[in-house]
Each structure stands twice: as structure tokens, then as C-alpha cells.
């Protein structure tokens, strides 16, 4: 004799966090930050063949104040890093970052002083998407993985604490230019 048997039909048992996550995952507004060839693949996901609109992303936002997902597609130079951080800070909460491509994830083949070796040294990244450039199907798969992550995210004070810890961990990692071994 469980609780489900005592309740009348049509009653849903859930938490506020689960319902909020379910609603939030279907209404992402991405801000495009296309810096290289990955941006071409990102643009093709909005076309009729891949149709990113079926996942609630009807339009790509040109302003950070109306976006909650930043897709960083391509390499980030040292001069571009403060601009990227400023755009991230202007985005509304809750916000997520997807590093698209090897250049955004780890600097790619550009291992020099002018390129940031991974966008996670500038902003906290939620999803890493490998490839050079990754196919649109891979971007859609990464967005679906982000949907799963969003649905399980905590709310309120718990979320702020999780974000603070992730940001501190990301900024504490040394850049690959300072690492020794096979990377150099």
C-alpha cells in the first residue's frame, strides 16, 4: 500500500527543482560567440536539416542580456578574453557555457602566447564539445546533454554555491603554456 495507490489519478509527485529544470531546459536562448570555423557548423544547426528550433532555441540572441547559453565556437585570443568575460557577466542567471570545438576547449593546434589555452580559463564551462570542427549532430547531442544537466541543477543558494565552486576550480587550473611534458 504505497503512496501512489492512495492518491487519486492525475496527481503528480515531484519537487520544485525538477519542475523548474524541466521547464528551463526547453527554453534556452543561445548567444553566439563564433570566432572561427566552428561557427559555420553552429549556423548550420539552425537550418531545416538539423532544426535546432525543435529544442526550444528559436533564435540566436545577439545581446547577452537576453541569452542564457553562450556557445563559444573557435579559438579565443588573449585580447578577446576580457570581452568574453564581460559578455558572460552580462548574461542573465541562470547561464551556461558550451565550448564548441578543440580550439575553444583546449586551444587546439594554436599553442602559443596569443591564444587562450581553453576558454575554461576565462569562464566556467558546462559542456565541452570536441572536434575540428564538430558536426552539427555533435552540437545537437551536446545540447541534449546540457538539457539533462539543466534538469538536474539545484535552485537558489545551492546553485550559487555550486557555480562559485566550479568557477574557482576552473580559474585555479594553470594554463597549458605553463605545463611541462607532452603538451610542449
From Swiss-Prot:
Binds 1 [4Fe-4S] cluster. Its main location: membrane. One of its GO terms (molecular function) is NADH dehydrogenase (ubiquinone) activity. It comes from the Bacteria. It holds the Pfam family Oxidored_q6. [4Fe-4S] cluster binds at residues 37-38, 103, 132. It is a peripheral membrane protein. PROSITE patterns: COMPLEX1_20K. Its cofactor is [4Fe-4S] cluster. InterPro entries: NADH_UbQ_OxRdtase-like_20kDa (IPR006137), NADH_UQ_OxRdtase_20Kd_su (IPR006138). Keywords: 4Fe-4S, Cell membrane, Iron, Iron-sulfur, Membrane, Metal-binding, NAD, Quinone, Translocase, Transport. It is an enzyme of class 7 (translocase). One of its GO terms (cellular component) is plasma membrane. GO terms for biological process: aerobic respiration; electron transport coupled proton transport. Its EC number is 7.1.1.-. It catalyses: a quinone + NADH + 5 H(+)(in) = a quinol + NAD(+) + 4 H(+)(out). It is found in: Cell membrane. The keyword Translocase applies. NCBIfam families: nuoB_fam, PRK06411.1. NDH-1 shuttles electrons from NADH, via FMN and iron-sulfur (Fe-S) centers, to quinones in the respiratory chain. The immediate electron acceptor for the enzyme in this species is believed to be a menaquinone. Couples the redox reaction to proton translocation (for every two electrons transferred, four hydrogen ions are translocated across the cytoplasmic membrane), and thus conserves the redox energy in a proton gradient. Belongs to the complex I 20 kDa subunit family. PANTHER family: NADH DEHYDROGENASE (PTHR11995), NADH DEHYDROGENASE [UBIQUINONE] IRON-SULFUR PROTEIN 7, MITOCHONDRIAL (PTHR11995:SF14). NDH-1 is composed of 14 different subunits. Subunits NuoB, C, D, E, F, and G constitute the peripheral sector of the complex. This is NADH-quinone oxidoreductase subunit B. It comes from Mycolicibacterium smegmatis (strain ATCC 700084 / mc(2)155). The lineage of its organism: Bacteria, Bacillati, Actinomycetota, Actinomycetes, Mycobacteriales.
Amino acid at each position: 500500500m504505497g503512496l501512489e495507490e492512495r492518491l487519486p489519478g492525475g496527481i503528480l509527485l515531484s519537487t520544485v527543482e525538477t519542475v523548474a529544470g524541466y521547464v528551463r531546459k526547453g527554453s534556452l536562448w543561445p548567444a553566439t560567440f563564433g570566432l572561427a570555423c566552428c561557427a559555420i557548423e553552429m549556423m548550420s544547426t539552425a537550418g531545416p536539416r538539423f532544426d535546432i528550433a525543435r529544442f526550444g532555441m528559436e533564435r540566436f540572441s545577439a545581446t547577452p542580456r537576453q541569452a542564457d547559453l553562450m556557445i563559444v565556437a573557435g579559438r579565443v585570443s588573449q585580447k578577446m578574453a576580457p570581452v568574453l568575460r564581460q559578455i558572460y557577466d552580462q548574461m542573465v542567471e541562470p547561464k551556461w557555457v558550451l565550448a564548441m570545438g578543440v580550439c575553444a576547449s583546449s586551444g587546439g593546434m594554436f599553442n602559443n602566447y596569443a591564444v587562450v589555452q581553453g576558454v575554461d580559463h576565462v569562464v566556467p564551462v558546462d559542456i565541452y564539445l570536441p572536434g575540428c570542427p564538430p558536426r552539427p549532430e555533435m552540437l545537437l547531442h551536446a545540447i541534449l546533454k546540457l538539457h539533462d544537466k539543466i534538469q538536474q541543477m539545484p535552485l537558489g543558494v545551492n546553485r550559487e554555491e555550486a557555480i562559485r565552486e566550479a568557477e574557482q576550480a576552473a580559474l585555479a587550473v594553470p594554463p597549458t603554456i605553463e605545463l611541462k611534458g607532452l603538451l610542449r
